[in-house]
Every structure is written in structure tokens, then in C-alpha cells.
Curated annotation (Swiss-Prot):
Organism the protein comes from: Arabidopsis thaliana
Domain annotation Protein kinase: ranges: 361-640
Topology of this chain in the membrane: Single-pass type I membrane protein
Gene, per the UniProt record: LECRK63
Stretches in topological domain Extracellular: 15-306
Stretch list, region Legume-lectin like: 22-271
Protein EC: 2.7.11.1
Entry annotation: catalytic residues: 490 (proton acceptor)
SUPFAM superfamilies xref list: Concanavalin A-like lectins/glucanases, Protein kinase-like (PK-like)
Protein name stated in the entry: Lectin-domain containing receptor kinase VI.3
Cytoplasmic side: 328-688
Transmembrane intervals: 307-327
Compartments where located: Cell membrane
GO biological process entries: abscisic acid-activated signaling pathway; defense response to bacterium; defense response to oomycetes; seed germination
Length: 688
């Protein structure tokens, strides 16, 4: 009987168990070296000092940062189809620095999202998470804790501009509380504090799965101990209607038109499927230093100025002499002064740090030479981490100085997975330096030509097609998706760097130009590289997005064929491919080194799209958005019209009518350049 009882009860007990799912735990005490673990989009970026910046203080920008892998948040009960949310905890330290003490915005969120891609999310009150069309949709499956700093938006739902809310599929908060913490000595006493203080603030969120209770505590990070009483503590059964089996965890942020702040995360920990946090693991001493609070500094300077005015003349003179002496001494020690405009641009780095990182700019550190300078590989800390590329502009070159300023202005604000990130800059006497992400795989030029000659390894078709679509995506961002129109003007293989996963990054923006949307180029100086310049440049010298499309078309043909665009002025790649197309033999243009190792449909598609981009009339060329739709197979590719070609006289004009910078594609570079906000050239040349 005992045996029979056991046999009957064992299956019943088994049915009551839940499926064990692995725990997820991570902790980032700063984000240096963790670029592969954090997915950033928009204005978000990981800075050299280890800070995760969600937005800078530009107007109407968004930024998102998510952990790179989804987190399992549901426990499945094997006895039924019901699932319960796993307990989880997260802690993070953040800093918000407003444009001024009274004009910051809009805030940020900690988010559970079914995808890290928040494409279409709007700025301002939508916090980079949702938009006007989908705000409130039950299909969003989004939970967010909002840290809002602006009052009166979202149909007046925000009672105060300094508040925290719990949001379910909407940015209208179900639960909203002013920002306070409770004193441990008197748990009923509230201490309020501003989110936009510019000082580190700590947030700890605990969700208990069995009771469906959420506890949220927010307090200044310099407090000695965590407040015992949380700011928000309540059941949130609504969360079970939102959470899917796997969710992405991360942050979104946004600024507004007239109200903007820089949002930073100094450290972040997360745990699911285990015990809730009993103590915080983010020690301030182990985190990166908080960013400088220029809004606070401006208030301090006004007080100092009032004090100086009240002092006697002798005291004023002594203070002035002391000030200039200290500044002069700092200059001698290569100290760096952070100026207001640098808050929204890449930061200035110390020359001595770059000198040490490149072993004194030794020849064995050179990874490329081209344009106006030489590129060196460097290490800012240990030999295996924080690798950078340092472009040293050729001395005594005014063209080089102009390029230097252009790159600081533009690429410092552009952020896209197919563009090279500019990290910082430096000027020491006659040395001008730009610092980029280091991309060890080299340029597309070397992968197409140099490496096959040296090792016999030929770039595969899948890699070529992926590279082509990546470059197209980067150009689409420059032409249509950024706040202004950026014309690159020098698209070629040596200006495309390739990551280990064959993701391309377009660089070398020293010749780029920036325009307001709807305006046209006033520049009539012809610049670029022979073989990639559109025929209309010989007639009017005016670059446009259509001339960039032409250069991309030539590059696309080059990627497929493995042949350079010109050869001693007698061979023109586009004409040759067009002749093969006219004879119905266009696949004969495919790189013979590939053998039969390519997709014929994709190769034909790429070649025809390349020819469409090389049309003699700019108005007949497709936009980069259309090009990308062709390459992705979203739209049918039209026939090439009979007016495609252009005359030999146009070609000869391209070789003789130049008044600006024109190069042949013989220089190789491992790192590109950049250009965008107005920065005074005198301030850069003088070292400020």
C-alpha cells in the first residue's frame, strides 16, 4: 500500500513544480570596455571616461541604451498554461545636468521593452520611448519608470516637474510621486531633492514576483545608507499583462525644443530569478567620476563676480594676477580647460595621455596614412582595452586645420552604427589630433585589394552584400535621418572601415558639408576622389546628396566586381558594367575571384542598383532611402533608361576643372574624420 501511495503522489508533486529558468545577473561599474554588452542608439554613447551618456544637451534628441541580450522574466508553471513574473532587482546611479538651473528637460526612463529598437519614438514628453500614435496602445508591452523633470505635458497629467512615475504601455503615469526620500531616523519625514541637481542620484527597484509588489527607492547617492522606507511600494498586477517571456532592460531619454539636459548613467546592476537586493553593489568610489556640472559653475561664477566687484582695487589686482598665474601654470602642465561648447562635442583629451597611448607616435603604431594626416593605434589604459585610433593632422597645413575643425564640428554629434565615432580631440602647439574608435579589421580598400594579394583570402559575397547595405544605411542617416543634411563628398573604399562582424563604418568627414533641410549648396569648389565624382561637379562644382549617391553607385560596382573605378583614364567601371548589361551579360562583371561562391540574384540586383546610382542626370538617381529598399528587396528595381550615359568630355572636365581638394584613391587610412556645429577656428588654432 505504501508503494502504491508513493506511485500515485509522485506525478502529482511533479505537476506542481515550475520550470527552472536561469538567473540573469550583471553589474557595470562604469561602461568602459562594455560596448559589446550595451546597445546604444540615437544620441546615446559610451564615453572614454566610462560614463554612459543617454543624451547631450542638444534640442529634440533621443537616446536609448539596452543590455544586449533579452532577460527571461516569466516562470512557467508546468501544471497549467499560466506564467508568473520572476522577481527582479535593479540599481543604477545617474546624473542629470540641465542647460541652466531653470531650463532643463525632459527626463529619462528605466524600461522593460520587447525590443531594444525604439525606432519612431519621439523626443520631449515621449522620452524616446513612444510616440503620439502608439502612446497607450496595449500592444506596446512596455513598462517604464519615468524620471520626469518637466511639468504640464501629457495633457496636464504631470502634477509637478520633479517627479517619478510608473507607466504601463503609456507615458501617462498610473502612479506618480514627487521626488523625495524618507529619513531613517524619522520614517515619516520627507526630504525632497531635485533630479536636475547635477549630483549623483541612486535608484533601486525591487519587484517581488509572488506578491506582485514593486518597491522603488530614490535618494542622493552620497547618503551613508539606503532609506528603509521606499518612495513607492504597492502591488502592480497590471505588470503581468505587459511582460512577455523575454524582455530587454535598459534606458531611454529625450530632450525638448527649449528644455534640454544631459542624462548620464554612472553604473548599473540587474538581477532576475534570484533574491532581491539587500544592499547596493554600486560603490561611488568604484564608479567613473560624475560629469562636470557647468550649470552649477555658472551660478558660482556670478557669486564670485559679485564678491570681486565689492572688493577693493588692490584685492582685485591681486586676484587677477593669481588667476593668470594659475592658468599659465596649468598650460605649462598641459592641463585642459573644458569650455561650454565642449559639453555638446567630443571632449578635449590631454596630449601627454595620447603621447603615452601611442608610445610617442612611433612608426610601429601607424595603421594608415592619407588625406591630411597619419593614423596611429593607441591604448588609453591597459594594452588589451580602450584601444583608440589617433589621427595626427599634417603640421603647417591650413587645409589640414580646416579639416580638423570640420571633423570636430560634425562627427562629434553624429551617432550611427555605420559611421565611425569621433571620441575626442587635442591641440598641442602645431600638433592637431583627432581620436576615434579603433577598428582593427582595416578598410574596405585593404579587404578588396591588399589582403587578397598578401594572404590569398578573398572577401566573401555575403560579406560584400552586408557591407554594401551597411554603407547605404549610413548614407541614409546622413542625408535624411539626422537633424540636418550632411553631404559626405568623399565616398570610397579607403574611407570605409570594417569591424570584425563585417559591419561597415563610413568615415573621413573632413570634406563633408552640412546644410539645413530645404537649402542648397553654395560651395562651388570641386572636391573628392577621381573616379567617384558625379559628372555635374565638372559643370557647377555643387555637391549634393545626388552626387553622394553617384559615388555610392561607383563603390557598389567596385564591391561586386573587385575592380577600381578607373585605370589610367582609359577604363571606366560604370561604362564597362553598362556594356555588359546591354549585352545581357551583367553577371560577367562579378569578381572572378569569387568563382561560383556568390548569389546571382543579389549580384544582379547590386549591379543594376549601382548603375541606377551612376545615372548622368542627378534627378534620375534614386535617393539613399530608395537604394536601401532596393537592396533589401522591399521595392522592385526599375529598368535603366536610354539616357543613362554621359560624354567623354564630361569625364575630361572632371580631370582638369579642379580648384579644390582632389585625390586619387591611393591613400589608405584606418580611421576617418568629421564636421558639424559652428566652432570658431581661432579658438581651435589658439589651443582653446
Amino acid at each position: 500500500m505504501l508503494v502504491l501511495f508513493l506511485l500515485l503522489t509522485i506525478p502529482t508533486r511533479a505537476q506542481r513544480t515550475t520550470t527552472e529558468t536561469p538567473k540573469t545577473e550583471f553589474i557595470f561599474r562604469g561602461f568602459s570596455g562594455n560596448q559589446s554588452n550595451i546597445v546604444t542608439t540615437g544620441a546615446a554613447t559610451i564615453k572614454l571616461d566610462g560614463l554612459l551618456r543617454l543624451t547631450d544637451r542638444n534640442s529634440n534628441v533621443t537616446g536609448t541604451s539596452f543590455y544586449h541580450k533579452p532577460v527571461r522574466l516569466l516562470e512557467t508553471n508546468t501544471s497549467s498554461t499560466n506564467s508568473t513574473i520572476r522577481s527582479f532587482s535593479t540599481s543604477f546611479v545617474f546624473v542629470i545636468i540641465p542647460t541652466s538651473s531653470s531650463n532643463g528637460g525632459f527626463g529619462f526612463t528605466f524600461t522593460l521593452s520587447p525590443t531594444p529598437d525604439r525606432t519612431g519614438a519621439e523626443s520631449a514628453q515621449y522620452l524616446g520611448l513612444l510616440n503620439k500614435a502608439n502612446d497607450g496602445n496595449s500592444t506596446n508591452h512596455v513598462f517604464a519608470v519615468e524620471f520626469d523633470t518637466v511639468q504640464g505635458f501629457k495633457d496636464g497629467a504631470d502634477r509637478t516637474g520633479n517627479h517619478i512615475g510608473l507607466n504601463f504601455n503609456s507615458l501617462t503615469s498610473d502612479v506618480q510621486e514627487p521626488v523625495v526620500y524618507y529619513d531613517n531616523e524619522d520614517p515619516n519625514r520627507k526630504e525632497d531633492f531635485p533630479l536636475q541637481s547635477g549630483d549623483p542620484i541612486r535608484a533601486i527597484l525591487d519587484y517581488d514576483g509572488p506578491t506582485q509588489t514593486l518597491n522603488l527607492t530614490v535618494y542622493p547617492a552620497n547618503l551613508k545608507s539606503r532609506p528603509v522606507r521606499p518612495l513607492i511600494s504597492r502591488p502592480v498586477p497590471k505588470l503581468s499583462q505587459i511582460v512577455q517571456e523575454e524582455m530587454y532592460v535598459g534606458f531611454t531619454a529625450a530632450t525638448g525644443r527649449d528644455q534640454s539636459s544631459a542624462h548620464y548613467v554612472m553604473g548599473w546592476s540587474f538581477s532576475s530569478g534570484g533574491d532581491l537586493l539587500t544592499e547596493d553593489t554600486l560603490d561611488l568610489l568604484e564608479l567613473p567620476r560624475p560629469p562636470p556640472n557647468t550649470a552649477k559653475k555658472r551660478g558660482y561664477n556670478s557669486q564670485v563676480l559679485a564678491l570681486i566687484v565689492a572688493l577693493s582695487g588692490v584685492t582685485v589686482i591681486l586676484l587677477a594676477l593669481l588667476f593668470f598665474f594659475v592658468m599659465y601654470k596649468k598650460r605649462l602642465q598641459q592641463g585642459e580647460v573644458l569650455e561650454d561648447w565642449e559639453i555638446n562635442h567630443p571632449h578635449r583629451l590631454r596630449y601627454k595621455d595620447l603621447y603615452a597611448a601611442t608610445d610617442g607616435f612611433k612608426e610601429n603604431r601607424i595603421v594608415g596614412t592619407g588625406g591630411f594626416g597619419t593614423v596611429f593605434r593607441g591604448n588609453l589604459s591597459s594594452p588589451s582595452s580602450d584601444q583608440i585610433a589617433v589621427k595626427k593632422i599634417t603640421p603647417n597645413s591650413m587645409q589640414g586645420v580646416r579639416e580638423f575643425i570640420a571633423e570636430i564640428e560634425s562627427l562629434g554629434r553624429l551617432r550611427h552604427k555605420n559611421l565611425v565615432n569621433l571620441q575626442g580631440w587635442c591641440k598641442q602647439k602645431n600638433d592637431l589630433l583627432l581620436i576615434y574608435d579603433y577598428i582593427p579589421n582595416g578598410s574596405l580598400d585593404s579587404l578588396l585589394y591588399s589582403r587578397p594579394r598578401q594572404s590569398g583570402v578573398v572577401l566573401s559575397w555575403n560579406a560584400r552584400f552586408k557591407i554594401a547595405k551597411g554603407i547605404a544605411s549610413g548614407l541614409l542617416y546622413l542625408h535624411e535621418e539626422w537633424e540636418k543634411v550632411v553631404i559626405h563628398r568623399d565616398i570610397k573604399p579607403s574611407n570605409v572601415l570594417i569591424e570584425d562582424d563585417m559591419n561597415p563604418r563610413l568615415g573621413d568627414f573632413g570634406l563633408a558639408r552640412l546644410y539645413e533641410r530645404g537649402s542648397q549648396s553654395n560651395t562651388t569648389v570641386v572636391v573628392g576622389t577621381i573616379g567617384y565624382m558625379a559628372p555635374e561637379l565638372a559643370r557647377n562644382g555643387k555637391s549634393s546628396s545626388a552626387s553622394d549617391v553617384f559615388a555610392f553607385g561607383v563603390l557598389l560596382l567596385e564591391i561586386v566586381s573587385g575592380r577600381r573605378p578607373t585605370d589610367s583614364g582609359t577604363f571606366f567601371l560604370a561604362d564597362w558594367v553598362m556594356e555588359l548589361h546591354a549585352r545581357g551579360e551583367i553577371l560577367h562583371a562579378v569578381d572572378p575571384r569569387l568563382g561560383f561562391g556568390y548569389d546571382g540574384v543579389e549580384a544582379r540586383l547590386a549591379l543594376v542598383v549601382g548603375l541606377l546610382c551612376c545615372h548622368q542626370r542627378p534627378t534620375s538617381r534614386p535617393s539613399m532611402r530608395t537604394v536601401l529598399r532596393y537592396l533589401n528587396g522591399d521595392d522592385d528595381v526599375p529598368e535603366i533608361d536610354n539616357d543613362w550615359g554621359y560624354s567623354d568630355s564630361s569625364r575630361s572636365d572632371l580631370g582638369s576643372n579642379f580648384e579644390g581638394y582632389v585625390s586619387s584613391d591611393r591613400a589608405s587610412s584606418s580611421v576617418p574624420s568629421f564636421s558639424v556645429t559652428r566652432v570658431s577656428s581661432s579658438s581651435v588654432i589658439s589651443g582653446r
